[in-house]
UniProtKB/Swiss-Prot annotation:
The organism of origin for this protein: Chlamydia trachomatis serovar D (strain ATCC VR-885 / DSM 19411 / UW-3/Cx)
UniProt keywords, alphabetically: Protein biosynthesis, Transferase
UniProt protein name: Methionyl-tRNA formyltransferase
Gene name of the record: fmt
Listed GO biological process terms: conversion of methionyl-tRNA to N-formyl-methionyl-tRNA
EC numbers for this chain: 2.1.2.9
GO cellular component, one term: cytosol
Residues that bind (6S)-5,6,7,8-tetrahydrofolate: G111, L112, L113, P114
Highest taxon, organism lineage: Bacteria
Molecular function (Gene Ontology), one example: methionyl-tRNA formyltransferase activity
General function of this protein: Attaches a formyl group to the free amino group of methionyl-tRNA(fMet). The formyl group appears to play a dual role in the initiator identity of N-formylmethionyl-tRNA by promoting its recognition by IF2 and preventing the misappropriation of this tRNA by the elongation apparatus.
Family named by the database record: Belongs to the Fmt family.
Reaction it catalyzes: L-methionyl-tRNA(fMet) + (6R)-10-formyltetrahydrofolate = N-formyl-L-methionyl-tRNA(fMet) + (6S)-5,6,7,8-tetrahydrofolate + H(+)
Length: 316
């Protein structure tokens, strides 16, 4: 493939896709990623996964503070790219930048557009109980995920799949979809189909508070919520020990109880069952497997329960 490609991306998802392109000998003339960020509880700067991969392959790298900076835009022009590929870069790009490459900018979106436009399509699709996801490649315009569709593929969401697991599956197939798109751009056969605005939905970035579990819902819905916010921002609930204030309990792993009848009041702690802690939902129950009490280490849910002699019998 002779196309000159500039790649813009930041997290591990984008690094996985970039590796697929590099393994296929795509001519990546430059990489753009976000500026290094301080590590949590430390002043040490952490490089993005995309930066680490680019440096390991000796690919020219830019980390602009602002993508509207004239010096940055001038450097992009010097690379004389035929096409820009954007994958989870993390910034909405202005038209001046989109107009630089000969054939435009193409974005790999980890969702089936026009549904789930925004930063969290993977998480919100699972939280909504979705059973099918996929990648969409669009030719970018100045809107948020509003460009014409060039290619789509599909990935089934397994009944126990978390957002982390779906992200891995989408990244693995997304690189191949981009290779197909680049081949079509080079051959002049790529199609651009406008999105159906009537079908558009939004998927804004999740907050930590949205990880909170609402037990007054069917177990299937609660389980979908837990899977959708795992590993980030993470699911949590609250618990009380007598004489103490309510504390958060992170829920790292759970599974559905096979019997779907009524067990008790929503959030009621039904006790230990095998290795799990059984919690009632509005309909059905969930088995908590791994939890993390506030300020403590990760542990088995049954060990948490057995260590809480004064635990009130309800989560909220």
């Amino acid at each position: 493939m002779s196309l000159r490609v500039v790649y813009l991306g930041t997290p591990q998802f984008a690094a996985t896709v970039l590796k697929t392109l590099l393994d296929a000998h795509t001519h990546i003339v430059g990489v753009v990623t976000r500026a290094d960020k301080p590590q949590k509880r430390s002043s040490k700067l952490i490089s993005s996964p995309v930066k680490q991969l680019a440096l390991s392959k000796n690919i020219p790298l830019l980390q602009p503070i602002k993508t509207t900076d004239p010096a940055f835009l001038a450097q992009l022009r010097e690379w004389q790219a035929d096409v820009f590929i954007v994958v989870a870069y993390g910034v909405i790009l202005k038209q001046e930048l989109l107009d630089i490459p000969t054939y435009g900018c193409y974005n790999l979106h980890a969702g089936l557009l026009p549904a789930y436009r925004g930063a969290a399509p993977i998480q919100r699709c699972i939280m909504d109980g979705g059973v099918l996801s996929g990648n969409t490649v669009i030719r970018m315009d100045a809107g948020m995920d509003t460009g014409d569709i060039a290619n789509v593929n599909y990935v089934a969401i397994g009944e126990d799949m978390t957002a982390g697991g779906l992200a891995e599956a989408l990244a693995a197939s997304g690189g191949e979809l981009l290779l197909k798109t680049l081949q079509e751009i080079e051959a002049g056969t790529v199609r651009h189909v406008p999105q159906n605005e009537a079908m558009a939905t939004l998927a804004p970035k999740l907050t930590k508070e949205e990880g909170g579990i609402h037990w007054d819902a069917p177990a299937s819905q609660v389980y979908a919520h837990i899977r959708g916010v795992s590993p980030a921002p993470g699911a949590w609930t609250r618990y009380l020990s007598q004489g103490k204030e309510a504390r958060r309990l992170g829920v790292l792993s759970a599974r559905m109880e096979s019997f779907s009848g009524n067990y008790g009041d929503p959030g009621e702690v039904l006790g230990v069952s095998g290795e799990d802690l059984l919690i009632a939902c509005r309909q059905g129950a969930l088995r908590l497997r791994m939890v993390q009490p506030e300020g403590k280490a990760l542990m088995k849910a049954k060990d948490f329960f057995n260590g809480q002699s004064r635990l009130v019998s309800k989560l909220f």
